Curated annotation (Swiss-Prot):
Expressed in osteoblasts. Not expressed in brain, heart, intestine, kidney, liver, muscle, spleen and testis. Residues 92-107 have a biased composition (Pro residues). SMART domains: HOX. GO terms for molecular function: DNA-binding transcription activator activity, RNA polymerase II-specific; DNA-binding transcription factor activity; HMG box domain binding; RNA polymerase II transcription regulatory region sequence-specific DNA binding; sequence-specific DNA binding. This is Homeobox protein aristaless-like 4. It is found in: Nucleus. It comes from Mus musculus (Mouse). Residues 68-133, 171-206 are annotated as: Disordered. GO terms for biological process: anterior/posterior pattern specification; digestive tract development; embryonic digit morphogenesis; embryonic forelimb morphogenesis; embryonic hindlimb morphogenesis; embryonic skeletal system morphogenesis; hair follicle development; limb morphogenesis. CDD domains: homeodomain. It holds the Pfam family OAR.
Amino acid sequence: MNAETCVSYCESPAAAMDAYYSPVSQSREGSSPFRGFPGGDKFGTTFLSAGAKGQGFGDAKSRARYGAGQQDLAAPLESSSGARGSFNKFQPQPPTPQPPPAPPAPPAHLYLQRGACKTPPDGSLKLQEGSGGHNAALQVPCYAKESNLGEPELPPDSEPVGMDNSYLSVKETGAKGPQDRASAEIPSPLEKTDSESNKGKKRRNRTTFTSYQLEELEKVFQKTHYPDVYAREQLAMRTDLTEARVQVWFQNRRAKWRKRERFGQMQQVRTHFSTAYELPLLTRAENYAQIQNPSWIGNNGAASPVPACVVPCDPVPACMSPHAHPPGSGASSVSDFLSVSGAGSHVGQTHMGSLFGAAGISPGLNGYEMNGEPDRKTSSIAALRMKAKEHSAAISWAT
């Protein structure tokens, strides 16, 4: 077999198919199922099998290797019915219905190129499988050569591979999914009707007690705040109330009593702190009201224009005792006293300045009106200064 013979056969597949379906070949089919084509070397079994091998491998070595062997094997197949019976064991039965003829094959140059063959339609495959024998070996190698190298072409109406039909199915109009059923069973709070809203617990009417009932309840409450069941039942019979109402009244009465007790304790604590804070102020005010007359003012009391009641009431009167003031120096001693005391006698300094600047002063002024509330900070600072001076004087006198 050579390449020219293969090309000439592949160029005329229609003629071979016509010869296969002709009445002559059908009448001959009953005698020999292996002779589908007219006899001759061109359409013989040797030629077809050798051509199939040549198409499968496409080289001269394979054609030369399998040519002789196929000729030896094809000879007994064409001869007798005994060989036909032994060969029928391995061949499928011919199909009863004959499908329509397959479309014409592509040109010869497409067979020589890799990847030119495509997957044939189902009808052509059935025809090749059912024709049996050498007819099946005619075009199967061409289709099987590139069947696994590319993606198969699917018709447009076929479903995509790997997808489940349940995901592609369209929901019916009346059908509901599991989520829809769950949402339908649980009503939303906005869809509640008036009857459902009125199903809540009804508010109990407020119990109004008469004066007699309150008096009896208060009597028992004065005896005990926690009456037992028997006492509550007896009280309920006397007051014409239920035992539950009596129990609720005692609970409320105990809460009211605890609230009053708490409020009373707070008032007691508040009054205690207020009295403890106000008592020292009163004693200090009484001390300020007592005006102590120093000796240097008493000696010059008649000649001095400054009355004794105007002397500032300093809380530390000992500042004047260790220093002896000579008589007749009232103004100088007052100025010295003001300069020594400094900020401690700020109120007295202002009043003394006004007294010395004025020509005459009415003696109707008293010490309480002239002396305001002394500043605590300034008085403490002045006291510390005086104590420091006393300490330094004592140390110098001892040395």
